[in-house]
């Protein structure tokens, strides 16, 4: 309810924001990206929302593009609109910059990204304790945050994903409770969110 997620299966517990963003980068994006595809990040990003995408771009041949900020330190929405095109598969942005405190209009970005059938990934680590989070109203595909940003313990986090997107994700870690059935040569996995 707090995130306004449409169903509980859309909320996956992780070890933190970095883990959640890596799961999206390597479990969702990497298997789908190919040479000629584009990933857009901004200069406002924490390393946790930049380095995984650099790695995915290098491994897939996708092009990593970077949107800047305007003279006030805000995301340059005009430049973002120029960068997004039919090759854009992923736009991944912070909701609030950890350096400047810049607040990104996520709903505005989502409208633009979805016009081109891209996905929007949001790093909400800095926003979660200070701003209301409504994943449905913002229309994000994925959103990540950590418990310690809300005075919780370290080592816990959340990955919200639209259910259809989560179902398309490949696991990035294997074993434990995620396994439904295992044979000497293969395994099947539990349904979301355990998988």
Please give the residue ranges for each predicted region.
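Pyridoxal 5′-phosphate
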Residues: 1-195
């Amino acid at each position: 309810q707090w995130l306004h997620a449409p169903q509980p299966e859309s909320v996956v517990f992780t070890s933190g924001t970095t883990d959640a963003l890596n799961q999206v980068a390597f479990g969702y994006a990497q298997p789908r990206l190919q040479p000629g595809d584009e990933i857009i990040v901004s200069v406002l990003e924490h390393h946790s929302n930049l380095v995984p995408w650099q790695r995915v771009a290098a491994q897939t041949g996708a092009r990593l593009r970077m949107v800047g900020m305007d003279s006030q330190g805000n995301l340059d929405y005009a430049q973002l609109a120029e960068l997004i095109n039919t090759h854009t598969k992923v736009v991944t942005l912070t909701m609030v910059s950890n350096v400047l405190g810049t607040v990104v209009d996520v709903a505005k970005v989502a409208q633009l990204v979805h016009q081109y059938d891209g996905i929007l990934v949001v790093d909400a680590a800095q926003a979660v304790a200070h701003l209301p989070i409504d994943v449905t109203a913002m229309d994000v595909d994925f959103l990540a945050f950590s418990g310690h940003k809300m005075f919780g313990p370290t080592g816990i986090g959340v990955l919200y994903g639209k259910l259809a997107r989560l179902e398309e994700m490949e696991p990035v870690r294997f074993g434990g409770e995620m396994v439904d059935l295992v044979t000497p040569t293969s395994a099947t996995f539990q349904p979301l969110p355990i998988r």
